[in-house]
Protein backbone atom coordinates (compact mmCIF):
# COMPACT_ATOMS: atom_id res chain seq x y z
CA UNK A 1 0.00 0.00 0.00
CA UNK A 2 1.74 3.17 -1.23
CA UNK A 3 0.61 6.31 0.56
CA UNK A 4 1.36 9.93 -0.30
CA UNK A 5 0.66 12.98 1.86
CA UNK A 6 -0.62 16.29 0.53
CA UNK A 7 -0.37 19.31 2.84
CA UNK A 8 -2.71 22.12 1.83
CA UNK A 9 -0.92 25.40 2.57
CA UNK A 10 -2.28 27.82 -0.01
CA UNK A 11 -4.62 29.96 2.09
CA UNK A 12 -4.01 33.67 2.52
CA UNK A 13 -5.31 33.84 6.07
CA UNK A 14 -6.94 37.26 5.72
CA UNK A 15 -8.21 37.15 9.30
CA UNK A 16 -4.62 37.06 10.54
CA UNK A 17 -4.21 40.65 9.25
CA UNK A 18 -0.57 39.89 8.49
CA UNK A 19 1.71 40.15 5.46
CA UNK A 20 3.17 36.79 6.48
CA UNK A 21 1.43 33.76 4.91
CA UNK A 22 -0.70 32.00 7.50
CA UNK A 23 1.29 28.74 7.48
CA UNK A 24 4.45 30.71 8.33
CA UNK A 25 2.94 32.21 11.48
CA UNK A 26 5.07 30.95 14.38
CA UNK A 27 4.01 28.33 16.90
CA UNK A 28 6.57 27.41 19.54
CA UNK A 29 9.21 29.37 17.64
CA UNK A 30 8.68 27.54 14.33
CA UNK A 31 6.30 28.13 11.40
CA UNK A 32 3.07 26.17 11.76
CA UNK A 33 3.88 24.38 8.52
CA UNK A 34 7.17 23.15 10.02
CA UNK A 35 5.23 21.21 12.67
CA UNK A 36 2.94 19.64 10.07
CA UNK A 37 5.87 18.77 7.80
CA UNK A 38 7.78 17.16 10.68
CA UNK A 39 4.75 15.01 11.55
CA UNK A 40 4.29 14.01 7.91
CA UNK A 41 7.97 13.07 7.68
CA UNK A 42 7.66 10.86 10.77
CA UNK A 43 5.03 8.78 8.94
CA UNK A 44 7.63 7.67 6.36
CA UNK A 45 5.23 7.67 3.42
CA UNK A 46 6.18 7.38 -0.26
CA UNK A 47 6.14 11.09 -1.00
CA UNK A 48 5.07 14.39 0.59
CA UNK A 49 3.50 17.18 -1.46
CA UNK A 50 2.84 20.78 -0.37
CA UNK A 51 0.30 22.96 -2.17
CA UNK A 52 0.98 26.70 -1.87
CA UNK A 53 -0.76 29.76 -3.22
CA UNK A 54 -0.68 33.13 -1.46
CA UNK A 55 2.93 33.95 -0.60
CA UNK A 56 4.06 30.69 -2.15
CA UNK A 57 7.59 31.93 -2.83
CA UNK A 58 8.03 32.92 0.81
CA UNK A 59 6.68 29.58 1.99
CA UNK A 60 9.05 27.63 -0.25
CA UNK A 61 11.98 29.83 0.77
CA UNK A 62 11.31 29.01 4.43
CA UNK A 63 11.95 25.30 3.76
CA UNK A 64 15.00 25.13 1.48
CA UNK A 65 16.05 21.66 2.64
CA UNK A 66 12.74 19.81 2.43
CA UNK A 67 12.40 16.79 0.17
CA UNK A 68 8.71 17.52 -0.38
CA UNK A 69 7.31 18.36 -3.82
CA UNK A 70 5.81 21.82 -4.29
CA UNK A 71 2.59 22.51 -6.19
CA UNK A 72 0.97 25.86 -6.98
CA UNK A 73 -2.72 26.63 -6.63
CA UNK A 74 -2.97 29.49 -9.12
CA UNK A 75 -6.31 30.79 -7.84
CA UNK A 76 -7.76 30.50 -4.36
CA UNK A 77 -10.81 28.43 -5.34
CA UNK A 78 -11.09 26.23 -2.26
CA UNK A 79 -9.67 23.05 -0.77
CA UNK A 80 -10.96 20.79 -3.54
CA UNK A 81 -9.20 22.88 -6.16
CA UNK A 82 -6.04 22.94 -4.02
CA UNK A 83 -5.87 19.14 -3.91
CA UNK A 84 -6.48 19.03 -7.66
CA UNK A 85 -3.26 21.05 -8.10
CA UNK A 86 -1.23 18.15 -6.68
CA UNK A 87 -2.90 15.35 -8.66
CA UNK A 88 -0.03 14.97 -11.18
CA UNK A 89 2.31 14.05 -8.33
CA UNK A 90 0.09 11.26 -7.02
CA UNK A 91 0.72 8.92 -9.95
CA UNK A 92 1.82 5.57 -8.55
CA UNK A 93 0.29 6.10 -5.10
CA UNK A 94 -2.62 3.97 -3.88
CA UNK A 95 -4.04 6.54 -1.50
CA UNK A 96 -3.39 10.04 -0.22
CA UNK A 97 -3.57 11.50 3.27
CA UNK A 98 -4.67 15.14 3.19
CA UNK A 99 -3.35 17.43 5.93
CA UNK A 100 -3.53 21.18 6.51
CA UNK A 101 -0.66 23.57 7.07
CA UNK A 102 -2.61 25.49 9.71
CA UNK A 103 -3.43 22.43 11.85
CA UNK A 104 -0.06 21.95 13.57
CA UNK A 105 -0.81 19.86 16.68
CA UNK A 106 -1.63 16.51 15.08
CA UNK A 107 0.69 13.73 16.18
CA UNK A 108 2.22 11.04 14.02
CA UNK A 109 0.74 8.42 16.36
CA UNK A 110 -2.80 9.65 15.70
CA UNK A 111 -2.32 9.80 11.94
CA UNK A 112 -0.67 6.38 11.89
CA UNK A 113 -3.71 4.94 13.66
CA UNK A 114 -6.00 6.75 11.20
CA UNK A 115 -4.18 5.18 8.25
CA UNK A 116 -4.15 1.72 9.82
CA UNK A 117 -7.85 1.73 10.66
CA UNK A 118 -9.11 3.06 7.32
CA UNK A 119 -9.87 0.17 4.93
CA UNK A 120 -7.78 0.07 1.76
CA UNK A 121 -10.58 1.03 -0.62
CA UNK A 122 -12.47 3.37 1.72
CA UNK A 123 -12.57 7.13 2.04
CA UNK A 124 -11.47 7.99 5.58
CA UNK A 125 -12.38 11.18 7.37
CA UNK A 126 -11.68 12.51 10.86
CA UNK A 127 -14.48 13.50 13.21
CA UNK A 128 -15.17 14.61 16.76
CA UNK A 129 -18.25 15.28 18.85
CA UNK A 130 -18.13 18.71 20.49
CA UNK A 131 -20.48 20.86 22.52
CA UNK A 132 -19.77 23.99 20.45
CA UNK A 133 -19.74 23.00 16.75
CA UNK A 134 -20.05 26.55 15.42
CA UNK A 135 -17.79 27.13 12.41
CA UNK A 136 -17.15 23.47 11.64
CA UNK A 137 -18.59 21.31 8.89
CA UNK A 138 -21.21 18.85 10.19
CA UNK A 139 -21.17 15.09 9.60
CA UNK A 140 -24.42 13.97 7.94
CA UNK A 141 -25.53 10.40 8.65
CA UNK A 142 -28.47 8.36 7.41
CA UNK A 143 -30.97 6.42 9.52
CA UNK A 144 -28.52 3.52 9.73
CA UNK A 145 -25.75 5.76 11.03
CA UNK A 146 -23.75 5.66 7.80
CA UNK A 147 -21.94 8.85 6.78
CA UNK A 148 -23.67 10.43 3.80
CA UNK A 149 -21.74 13.65 3.48
CA UNK A 150 -20.34 16.77 5.12
CA UNK A 151 -22.13 20.10 5.22
CA UNK A 152 -19.97 23.18 5.72
CA UNK A 153 -21.22 25.46 8.48
CA UNK A 154 -22.27 28.34 6.22
CA UNK A 155 -24.34 25.94 4.11
CA UNK A 156 -26.10 24.18 7.02
CA UNK A 157 -29.86 24.25 7.38
CA UNK A 158 -31.26 25.12 10.80
CA UNK A 159 -31.68 21.50 11.86
CA UNK A 160 -28.19 20.62 10.59
CA UNK A 161 -26.64 23.36 12.72
CA UNK A 162 -27.73 21.40 15.79
CA UNK A 163 -25.49 18.46 14.80
CA UNK A 164 -22.54 18.20 17.19
CA UNK A 165 -20.44 15.71 15.20
CA UNK A 166 -17.97 17.76 13.19
CA UNK A 167 -15.51 17.23 10.39
CA UNK A 168 -11.91 17.84 11.47
CA UNK A 169 -10.61 18.06 7.91
CA UNK A 170 -7.98 15.35 7.57
CA UNK A 171 -8.92 12.70 5.00
CA UNK A 172 -7.60 9.52 3.43
CA UNK A 173 -8.63 9.20 -0.22
CA UNK A 174 -8.13 6.43 -2.80
CA UNK A 175 -6.12 7.90 -5.66
CA UNK A 176 -7.63 5.95 -8.57
CA UNK A 177 -11.11 7.60 -8.51
CA UNK A 178 -9.93 10.90 -7.02
CA UNK A 179 -9.46 12.86 -10.25
CA UNK A 180 -13.02 12.08 -11.32
CA UNK A 181 -14.44 13.06 -7.95
CA UNK A 182 -12.58 16.37 -7.93
CA UNK A 183 -13.54 17.12 -11.51
CA UNK A 184 -17.20 16.72 -10.61
CA UNK A 185 -17.16 19.23 -7.73
CA UNK A 186 -18.81 22.61 -8.11
CA UNK A 187 -18.62 25.95 -6.33
CA UNK A 188 -22.37 26.33 -5.90
CA UNK A 189 -22.33 27.03 -2.18
CA UNK A 190 -22.35 29.92 0.30
CA UNK A 191 -18.64 30.63 -0.10
CA UNK A 192 -18.38 30.12 -3.85
CA UNK A 193 -15.55 27.64 -3.35
CA UNK A 194 -14.81 24.07 -4.39
CA UNK A 195 -15.07 22.11 -1.14
CA UNK A 196 -12.92 19.01 -0.73
CA UNK A 197 -15.57 17.75 1.69
CA UNK A 198 -17.98 17.28 -1.23
CA UNK A 199 -15.98 14.23 -2.35
CA UNK A 200 -17.68 12.31 0.46
CA UNK A 201 -21.01 12.41 -1.37
CA UNK A 202 -19.23 11.54 -4.63
CA UNK A 203 -17.58 8.54 -3.01
CA UNK A 204 -20.89 7.34 -1.63
CA UNK A 205 -22.48 7.68 -5.07
CA UNK A 206 -19.73 5.46 -6.50
CA UNK A 207 -20.30 2.81 -3.84
CA UNK A 208 -17.22 3.53 -1.73
CA UNK A 209 -17.31 3.05 2.02
CA UNK A 210 -16.91 6.25 4.03
CA UNK A 211 -14.94 5.44 7.17
CA UNK A 212 -15.16 7.94 10.07
CA UNK A 213 -12.24 8.05 12.48
CA UNK A 214 -12.92 9.77 15.80
CA UNK A 215 -9.96 11.50 17.40
CA UNK A 216 -9.42 10.64 21.05
CA UNK A 217 -8.21 14.20 21.67
CA UNK A 218 -9.89 16.75 19.42
CA UNK A 219 -7.44 19.47 20.46
CA UNK A 220 -4.93 17.83 18.10
CA UNK A 221 -7.10 19.04 15.21
CA UNK A 222 -7.38 22.67 16.32
CA UNK A 223 -6.71 25.01 13.43
CA UNK A 224 -5.77 28.67 13.13
CA UNK A 225 -7.74 31.39 11.39
CA UNK A 226 -6.94 34.47 13.47
CA UNK A 227 -4.46 35.72 16.10
CA UNK A 228 -6.75 34.71 18.96
CA UNK A 229 -6.81 31.08 17.80
CA UNK A 230 -3.05 31.16 17.26
CA UNK A 231 -2.55 32.30 20.86
CA UNK A 232 -4.83 29.51 22.09
CA UNK A 233 -2.81 26.92 20.15
CA UNK A 234 0.42 28.39 21.49
CA UNK A 235 -0.73 27.74 25.05
CA UNK A 236 -1.88 24.21 24.18
CA UNK A 237 1.47 23.52 22.51
CA UNK A 238 3.44 24.89 25.46
CA UNK A 239 1.43 22.80 27.93
CA UNK A 240 2.14 19.71 25.85
CA UNK A 241 5.87 20.43 25.72
CA UNK A 242 6.17 21.12 29.42
CA UNK A 243 3.98 18.20 30.45
CA UNK A 244 6.28 15.84 28.56
CA UNK A 245 9.34 17.32 30.29
CA UNK A 246 7.66 17.23 33.68
CA UNK A 247 6.93 13.54 33.19
CA UNK A 248 10.69 13.12 32.68
CA UNK A 249 11.42 14.86 36.00
CA UNK A 250 11.63 18.60 35.25
CA UNK A 251 10.29 20.76 38.09
CA UNK A 252 8.44 23.87 36.94
CA UNK A 253 7.05 26.45 39.37
CA UNK A 254 4.25 27.47 36.98
CA UNK A 255 3.93 25.65 33.63
CA UNK A 256 1.61 28.38 32.33
CA UNK A 257 4.47 30.89 32.53
CA UNK A 258 7.32 29.05 30.82
CA UNK A 259 7.75 28.99 27.03
CA UNK A 260 9.81 26.65 24.86
CA UNK A 261 10.54 27.86 21.34
CA UNK A 262 12.76 25.04 20.17
CA UNK A 263 14.12 21.89 21.81
CA UNK A 264 14.78 21.64 25.54
CA UNK A 265 16.48 18.63 27.12
CA UNK A 266 17.09 18.29 30.85
CA UNK A 267 18.99 16.17 33.32
CA UNK A 268 17.63 15.14 36.69
CA UNK A 269 16.28 17.47 39.39
CA UNK A 270 16.24 20.69 37.38
CA UNK A 271 14.10 23.61 38.55
CA UNK A 272 12.59 26.38 36.42
CA UNK A 273 10.98 29.49 37.90
CA UNK A 274 8.21 31.52 36.19
CA UNK A 275 8.57 33.62 33.04
CA UNK A 276 11.55 31.72 31.67
CA UNK A 277 12.00 31.47 27.89
CA UNK A 278 13.93 28.70 26.14
CA UNK A 279 14.82 29.37 22.48
CA UNK A 280 16.52 27.07 19.98
CA UNK A 281 18.43 24.05 21.29
CA UNK A 282 18.98 24.24 25.04
CA UNK A 283 20.38 21.51 27.27
CA UNK A 284 20.28 21.62 31.07
CA UNK A 285 22.52 19.25 33.01
CA UNK A 286 21.61 17.74 36.36
CA UNK A 287 20.38 19.91 39.24
CA UNK A 288 20.28 23.15 37.25
CA UNK A 289 18.22 26.00 38.68
CA UNK A 290 16.88 28.69 36.34
CA UNK A 291 15.60 31.86 37.98
CA UNK A 292 12.60 33.97 37.03
CA UNK A 293 12.67 35.92 33.78
CA UNK A 294 15.77 34.23 32.38
CA UNK A 295 16.21 33.70 28.63
CA UNK A 296 18.28 30.75 27.41
CA UNK A 297 18.97 30.44 23.70
CA UNK A 298 21.09 27.75 22.01
CA UNK A 299 22.95 27.09 25.24
CA UNK A 300 24.48 24.13 27.06
CA UNK A 301 24.29 24.37 30.82
CA UNK A 302 26.43 22.06 32.98
CA UNK A 303 25.50 20.25 36.17
CA UNK A 304 24.71 22.23 39.34
CA UNK A 305 24.62 25.59 37.57
CA UNK A 306 22.53 28.36 39.12
CA UNK A 307 21.12 30.95 36.74
CA UNK A 308 19.75 33.85 38.75
CA UNK A 309 16.76 35.97 37.65
CA UNK A 310 16.69 37.99 34.44
CA UNK A 311 19.90 36.62 32.98
CA UNK A 312 20.24 36.18 29.20
CA UNK A 313 22.41 33.36 27.86
CA UNK A 314 22.82 32.91 24.10
CA UNK A 315 25.10 30.62 22.12
CA UNK A 316 27.22 29.80 25.17
CA UNK A 317 28.45 26.91 27.30
CA UNK A 318 28.27 27.14 31.07
CA UNK A 319 30.50 24.81 33.09
CA UNK A 320 29.42 22.73 36.06
CA UNK A 321 28.80 24.60 39.31
CA UNK A 322 28.92 28.06 37.73
CA UNK A 323 26.74 30.91 38.98
CA UNK A 324 25.24 33.38 36.52
CA UNK A 325 23.44 36.62 37.30
CA UNK A 326 21.18 38.18 38.25
CA UNK A 327 20.88 40.45 35.22
CA UNK A 328 23.89 38.95 33.46
CA UNK A 329 24.23 38.76 29.68
CA UNK A 330 26.24 35.91 28.18
CA UNK A 331 26.63 36.36 24.43
CA UNK A 332 27.53 33.92 21.62
CA UNK A 333 30.91 32.24 21.59
CA UNK A 334 31.36 32.34 25.37
CA UNK A 335 32.58 29.45 27.52
CA UNK A 336 32.20 29.82 31.27
CA UNK A 337 34.40 27.45 33.30
CA UNK A 338 33.46 25.28 36.25
CA UNK A 339 32.50 27.13 39.44
CA UNK A 340 32.99 30.51 37.77
CA UNK A 341 30.80 33.45 38.79
CA UNK A 342 29.36 36.02 36.39
CA UNK A 343 27.37 38.53 38.41
CA UNK A 344 24.89 41.34 38.03
CA UNK A 345 25.19 43.63 35.03
CA UNK A 346 28.16 41.76 33.60
CA UNK A 347 28.26 41.22 29.83
CA UNK A 348 30.49 38.53 28.36
CA UNK A 349 30.97 38.10 24.59
CA UNK A 350 33.14 35.60 22.70
CA UNK A 351 35.20 35.02 25.82
CA UNK A 352 36.56 32.02 27.67
CA UNK A 353 36.36 32.33 31.45
CA UNK A 354 38.48 29.86 33.41
CA UNK A 355 37.39 27.67 36.30
CA UNK A 356 36.80 29.50 39.57
CA UNK A 357 37.16 32.96 38.06
CA UNK A 358 34.78 35.72 39.11
CA UNK A 359 33.38 38.88 37.57
CA UNK A 360 30.67 39.80 40.00
CA UNK A 361 29.71 43.37 39.14
CA UNK A 362 29.23 45.82 36.28
CA UNK A 363 31.81 44.65 33.74
CA UNK A 364 32.22 44.05 30.01
CA UNK A 365 34.44 41.13 28.99
CA UNK A 366 34.56 40.80 25.22
CA UNK A 367 36.96 38.86 22.97
CA UNK A 368 38.90 37.73 26.02
CA UNK A 369 40.60 34.64 27.38
CA UNK A 370 40.66 34.62 31.16
CA UNK A 371 42.52 31.98 33.15
CA UNK A 372 41.58 30.17 36.34
CA UNK A 373 41.11 31.80 39.73
CA UNK A 374 40.91 35.33 38.34
CA UNK A 375 39.09 38.14 40.17
CA UNK A 376 37.69 40.83 37.89
CA UNK A 377 36.78 43.93 39.88
CA UNK A 378 33.62 45.96 39.41
CA UNK A 379 33.60 48.25 36.40
CA UNK A 380 36.36 46.45 34.50
CA UNK A 381 36.16 46.82 30.71
CA UNK A 382 38.07 44.96 28.01
CA UNK A 383 38.36 47.64 25.34
CA UNK A 384 38.26 45.29 22.37
CA UNK A 385 37.24 47.57 19.48
CA UNK A 386 39.45 50.22 17.89
CA UNK A 387 36.75 51.53 15.58
CA UNK A 388 37.60 49.12 12.78
CA UNK A 389 38.70 45.77 14.22
CA UNK A 390 38.20 43.63 17.32
CA UNK A 391 41.23 42.64 19.42
CA UNK A 392 41.72 40.07 22.17
CA UNK A 393 42.64 40.40 25.81
CA UNK A 394 44.58 37.50 27.38
CA UNK A 395 44.56 37.23 31.17
CA UNK A 396 46.58 34.51 32.91
CA UNK A 397 45.79 32.48 36.02
CA UNK A 398 45.34 33.90 39.54
CA UNK A 399 45.18 37.49 38.33
CA UNK A 400 43.54 40.22 40.44
CA UNK A 401 42.11 43.13 38.49
CA UNK A 402 41.11 46.13 40.57
CA UNK A 403 37.84 47.95 40.09
CA UNK A 404 37.28 50.43 37.27
CA UNK A 405 40.16 49.15 35.15
CA UNK A 406 40.33 49.43 31.38
CA UNK A 407 42.25 46.76 29.49
CA UNK A 408 42.96 48.14 26.03
CA UNK A 409 43.32 45.23 23.60
CA UNK A 410 45.41 43.69 22.28
CA UNK A 411 47.01 43.14 25.65
CA UNK A 412 48.38 40.23 27.74
CA UNK A 413 48.37 40.04 31.54
CA UNK A 414 50.71 37.48 33.08
CA UNK A 415 49.92 34.87 35.74
CA UNK A 416 49.58 36.17 39.30
CA UNK A 417 49.60 39.82 38.28
CA UNK A 418 47.67 42.48 40.19
CA UNK A 419 46.16 45.49 38.45
CA UNK A 420 45.52 48.47 40.71
CA UNK A 421 42.04 49.97 40.73
CA UNK A 422 41.37 52.68 38.18
CA UNK A 423 44.20 51.64 35.86
CA UNK A 424 44.22 51.87 32.07
CA UNK A 425 46.40 49.04 30.80
CA UNK A 426 47.78 49.42 27.27
CA UNK A 427 50.96 47.33 27.46
CA UNK A 428 51.84 43.77 28.40
CA UNK A 429 51.75 43.15 32.16
CA UNK A 430 54.45 40.81 33.52
CA UNK A 431 53.57 37.98 35.90
CA UNK A 432 53.49 38.41 39.64
CA UNK A 433 53.83 42.14 40.19
CA UNK A 434 51.54 45.10 40.82
CA UNK A 435 50.82 47.28 37.83
CA UNK A 436 49.30 50.75 38.20
CA UNK A 437 48.47 53.47 35.76
CA UNK A 438 47.13 56.49 37.62
CA UNK A 439 47.70 60.20 37.93
CA UNK A 440 49.18 61.05 41.36
CA UNK A 441 46.55 62.08 43.86
CA UNK A 442 46.76 65.70 44.96
CA UNK A 443 44.70 68.02 47.12
CA UNK A 444 44.03 71.73 46.48
CA UNK A 445 43.42 73.30 49.87
CA UNK A 446 40.81 76.00 50.36
CA UNK A 447 39.38 75.34 46.89
CA UNK A 448 36.10 77.10 46.24
CA UNK A 449 33.29 75.47 44.34
CA UNK A 450 31.86 77.48 41.46
CA UNK A 451 28.71 79.42 42.32
CA UNK A 452 25.83 80.50 40.14
CA UNK A 453 25.83 84.09 39.03
CA UNK A 454 23.17 86.20 40.69
CA UNK A 455 20.62 87.66 38.27
From Swiss-Prot:
Keyword Transferase attached: yes
Binding positions for UDP-N-acetyl-alpha-D-glucosamine per the UniProt entry: 8-11, 22, 73, 78-79, 100-102, 137, 152, 167, 225, 331, 349, 364, 375
Stretch list, region Disordered: 420-455
Keyword field: Acyltransferase, Cell shape, Cell wall biogenesis/degradation, Cytoplasm, Magnesium, Metal-binding, Multifunctional enzyme, Nucleotidyltransferase, Peptidoglycan synthesis, Repeat, Transferase
One GO MF term: UDP-N-acetylglucosamine diphosphorylase activity
Cofactor binding, per record: Binds 1 Mg(2+) ion per subunit.
Enzyme class: transferase
Region ranges (N-acetyltransferase): 249-455
Pfam families named among the record's database cross-references: Hexapep, NTP_transf_3
Cofactor requirement: Mg(2+)
Record-annotated active site: 361 (proton acceptor)
Chief site of localization: cytoplasm
EC number(s) from the headed UniProt entry: 2.7.7.23, 2.3.1.157
Catalytic activity annotation: alpha-D-glucosamine 1-phosphate + acetyl-CoA = N-acetyl-alpha-D-glucosamine 1-phosphate + CoA + H(+); N-acetyl-alpha-D-glucosamine 1-phosphate + UTP + H(+) = UDP-N-acetyl-alpha-D-glucosamine + diphosphate
Subcellular location: Cytoplasm
Subunit structure comment from the entry: Homotrimer.
Described purpose of this protein according to its UniProt entry: Catalyzes the last two sequential reactions in the de novo biosynthetic pathway for UDP-N-acetylglucosamine (UDP-GlcNAc). The C-terminal domain catalyzes the transfer of acetyl group from acetyl coenzyme A to glucosamine-1-phosphate (GlcN-1-P) to produce N-acetylglucosamine-1-phosphate (GlcNAc-1-P), which is converted into UDP-GlcNAc by the transfer of uridine 5-monophosphate (from uridine 5-triphosphate), a reaction catalyzed by the N-terminal domain.
Family: In the N-terminal section; belongs to the N-acetylglucosamine-1-phosphate uridyltransferase family.
Protein name from the UniProt record: Bifunctional protein GlmU
Organism: Acidithiobacillus ferrooxidans (strain ATCC 23270 / DSM 14882 / CIP 104768 / NCIMB 8455)
